[in-house]
Swiss-Prot record:
Red blood cells. The modification N6-acetyllysine is found at residue 17. GO terms for cellular component: blood microparticle; haptoglobin-hemoglobin complex; hemoglobin complex. The keyword Iron applies. This is Hemoglobin subunit alpha.
């Protein structure tokens, strides 16, 4: 999916508003995913998946850091996320549909925390961005 200059601007501005809350929002999105789509828990059998767990917070920070990297390299996400794509495809073997589920939960989390900034245009841009990230992360599956 091609991001327009307006999409890139919207994504960078929205992610800039996330600021120091990125890890917190990442963890919240994971919790939403585990509650809404319980089958996603199977990839985390060794985690304490309870609300506020240190492991979920830690993984939420990893998710947020990866998204921050993607935002910073929006014009070259395949290169920037190559190692992460390898990890998920070859070692973790995550079902690609789970990226879409997490993307949805991230959108809900961002909308809940940034209602003024979450305009229809920003929503559409973030959705396209997360779909692009998902495409990059699943590219090594083929």
């Amino acid at each position: 999916m091609v991001l327009s200059p307006a999409d890139k601007s919207n994504v960078k501005a929205a992610w800039g508003k996330v600021g120091g809350h990125a890890g917190e929002y990442g963890a919240e999105a994971l919790e939403r995913m585990f509650l809404s789509f319980p089958t996603t828990k199977t990839y985390f059998p060794h985690f304490d998946l309870s609300h506020g767990s240190a492991q979920v917070k830690g993984h939420g920070k990893k998710v947020a850091d990866a998204l921050t990297l993607a935002v910073g390299h929006v014009d070259d996400m395949p290169h920037a996320l190559s190692a992460l794509s390898d990890l998920h495809a070859h070692k973790l073997r995550v079902d690609p549909v789970n990226f879409k589920l997490l993307s949805h939960c991230l959108l809900v989390t961002l909308a809940a925390h940034l209602p003024a900034e979450f305009t229809p245009a920003v929503h559409a841009s973030l959705d396209k961005f997360l779909a692009s990230v998902s495409t990059v992360l699943t590219s090594k599956y083929r």
